[in-house]
Every structure is written in C-alpha cells, then in structure tokens.
Amino acid sequence: MDKQLLETTVSKVLDEMRERPIPLGVSNRHIHLSAEDYARLFPGQPISEKKALLQPGQYAADQTVTLIGPKGQLKNVRLLGPLRRTSQVEISRTDARTLGIAAPLRMSGDLKGTPGIRLVSPFAELDLASGVIVAQRHIHMSPLDALIFRVAHGDKVSVAIEGNARRLIFDNVAIRVSADMRLEMHIDTDEANAAGADSPDAFATLVTPR
C-alpha cells in the first residue's frame, strides 16, 4: 500500500470514528462525600456498591440522604462512590427551585463560592457550608478519544442528541479528558427531558468543536 492510499484510508477510518454515537448518561441528583463527612453521616457503616457506572471504578452506592434547603427537601438522593477529597452535591435547576437554593452552573470540583445545604442520613445530619452545584454538561474522553475527535481537555463543543423525535443541539458542552475515562456524555434530568433523552435509543453525536 502506497503512502497516499494509506493516508486516505486512515483519514476515512478516522472520519467514520468521529461520526460514531457517543453513549449518553443522564445524571439524576446525587452527592459525593469526603471520608470525613461520610463517617459522620454513616458512622460504622462501610460504603457499599449498588450498581457500577460506566466510568471505571465509579458506582452508585446503597447509601442515600435527604437534602434539606430553605424551601423544601429531596429524599433518597444517591451517594456516588468512591469517596472524594471534598463533598459535593449535584442537582438540576428544577431541584434547586424545589430546595430554594441558588446553585451555580459549574464543572465538578469547582466549588468556590457555592451554597451549602443540610444532609440527613438515617443516622445523623450534617450542614455543608458549600458544595451545591448544577453540573455543566460534559463529555468524558480518553486521550485516544480526544485525538480521534480532534479536541482537548477544557474545549467546548456542540453536541446533537439524536435517536428520538426531539432532536436537540446542546452548545457549550465541556470536554473532560483523562486516561481513566471512557467515552460518555453526561447531562442532567432537565436537559434529558428537553431532549427526549429518556428514550433508550437516544445517543449523542459531536456536531462541531467550538
């Protein structure tokens, strides 16, 4: 195979790979806890896995809490594991209105200046001083995925949600690249409802890097 033919073949294969569906994950409200906060809310209770998530090593735990805000509460909010360095609560805009909390749109881990909330478990309660956010929609990628899609960590792209009658394009979708990540787009329940992404046939495709 000559060089030109090889380059043409590789280019064609990469184009096909860029057009492949991106798995879509709908993130319901959930919490991440530090080891210290977990021990206070679930004293003597080892964290236990209920369901593995697509991202390696991550899982939904059996443990749940109630979120209590100035105007309302949300029960049975799932803990995601493993435990983190800092506690964090991720909710939708609809959840924020229910709770009466002005949660800002942030990337996971960007918690400076965020509001707090009360967490109640079957064993104890804990007032977080900060950590409540509405998560920025994003796509997890491995370095190889990023190379194929020609994007880099921190880029913003436009993504189409397809496979249903309510095709919708989301702009400002953040790219998150890490060696331990698998290709998956994360949106919250408000975004999923708007896009009709509750359909099992729904998937994401990259429209254009921005």
UniProtKB/Swiss-Prot annotation:
Cofactor remark: There are 2 Zn(2+) ions per monomer; Zn(2+) and CoA bind inbetween the 2 domains in each monomer.
Residues annotated as binding Zn(2+) 2: H138, H140, H186
GO terms, molecular function: acyltransferase activity, transferring groups other than amino-acyl groups; metal ion binding
Binding-site residues, CoA: V26, S27, N28, K71, R78, N193
Binding site for Zn(2+) 1: H30, H32, E90
Co-factor requirement: Zn(2+)
UniProt cross-references to InterPro entries, sorted A to Z: PTAC (IPR008300)
Domain of life: Bacteria
Listed GO CC annotations: bacterial microcompartment
Positions that bind phosphate: R84
Protein EC: 2.3.1.222
GO biological process entries: propanediol catabolic process
Pfam families per record: PTAC (PF06130)
Reaction(s) catalysed (UniProt annotation): propanoyl-CoA + phosphate = propanoyl phosphate + CoA
The record's note on its domains: Formed by 2 beta-barrels, each is capped on both ends by short alpha-helices.
Family assignment from sequence similarity: Belongs to the PduL family.
Function noted in UniProt: Involved in 1,2-propanediol (1,2-PD) utilization within the bacterial microcompartment (BMC) dedicated to 1,2-PD degradation by catalyzing the conversion of propanoyl-CoA to propanoyl-phosphate.
The protein's name in its UniProt record: Phosphate propanoyltransferase
Protein species of origin: Citrobacter koseri (strain ATCC BAA-895 / CDC 4225-83 / SGSC4696)
Gene transcribed to yield this protein: pduL
